[in-house]
């Protein structure tokens, strides 16, 4: 996954998130409350600022539109934002309200209390005019738009309506993280991402089962004239309902949750980037689910980077397979490939006997892995090897060959086939990249036409001279004869 070419216009309520860490060791003599002995303080952008931070951490670029006060927290916020390469500060300063500041007091890795500094003043006409001007000035550079509504005033009706209408006129998708119960305010959005509670409040419908989630999402979708609703469901994962199609569920992976602060920001950031890169919403949902899984395991308003998201996707794959077996069945391999493709990953395929692993094999596997995001290796089973190589082969049985192959870092999955060629397996899996050694001509590669017809490609990898299993066996036999 590479999001470096994607720019997201982030519009919404920005705030300064302040975390004050301390220790609670006694009860106050003045009242029955704990005494917090203060230690270090950490500050970071929150609200739509955290959305932008997540976009940057995932490798994208962000343009940030919101309101800040002419005050010390506002200066601190802009100072933090100025330290982030890839971020364009399009914030509007106002003297009518303070910068929103949320201070969380933390002891023993738990929030003790939160103190909020904010104004309940409605958005003023001059503030709305300035925000709309900032949107108009920067939307031409955006590939996707995110509206992050924390119900703090920035996402007033005129701002929302203008942002969505302007984006739609340019063919730019708009993703909305809602706070309002009136989803009609987000009319025309491409995708709205409520949590389950927000979806229930917006529709007045139950959301306990998958069927109820779908019914509520369709009701919300109709009110907002939206293309899709993606509902986050905490430990139940996520549910995507699109205007055309049924409900799609991705489960959450069991983990220890330290802090859910800002998890919704991570979801919409990852979702928008993935969709902006060309993934379907279903594929983007898998990426967003993995990113959220990373940040809830961290304390405070956190972000996830690409390496963490890929590792989480791998862990989810392993969970779905019930562990990490050395050798997958054909059905398991097909399921695994489908999951990888749903995540927008390019799946590579190579095959062979791989009887005695040598440096030439490793070089081939490394080249194959460089050509894709996930590599599946198909091994000839023992009977197939014997037909191809003779009755004395294989030297190592399939189970041993699979264990060795699965332990090689370039390999993501191993499957076996019993036919003389892997053609039927290739038809089943439909890899994006088919890799063979450069000793083959393109017209000699089994399955090349199948892969190309499906939009994939064939890669011929260079081989290392003088490296082969047959030669290795010959040297072993010669050495054994010399010892006798």
From Swiss-Prot:
Return the annotated region ranges for Cytidylyltransferase: 349-484
Family statement drawn from the similarity comment of this UniProt entry: In the N-terminal section; belongs to the carbohydrate kinase PfkB family.
Give the residues the record marks as binding ATP.
Answer: 195-198
Query: What UniProt keywords apply to this chain's record, in alphabetical order?
Result: ATP-binding, Carbohydrate metabolism, Kinase, Multifunctional enzyme, Nucleotide-binding, Nucleotidyltransferase, Transferase
InterPro entries, per the entry: Bifunc_HldE, Carboh/pur_kinase_PfkB_CS, Cyt_trans-like, PfkB_dom, RfaE_dom_I, RfaE_dom_II, Ribokinase-like, Rossmann-like_a/b/a_fold
Name the Gene Ontology molecular function terms of this record.
ATP binding; heptose 7-phosphate kinase activity; heptose-1-phosphate adenylyltransferase activity; phosphotransferase activity, alcohol group as acceptor
Q: What name does this protein carry?
A: Bifunctional protein HldE
What Pfam families does the record point to? Answer: CTP_transf_like (PF01467), PfkB (PF00294)
Q: Which organism is it from?
A: Gluconacetobacter diazotrophicus (strain ATCC 49037 / DSM 5601 / CCUG 37298 / CIP 103539 / LMG 7603 / PAl5)
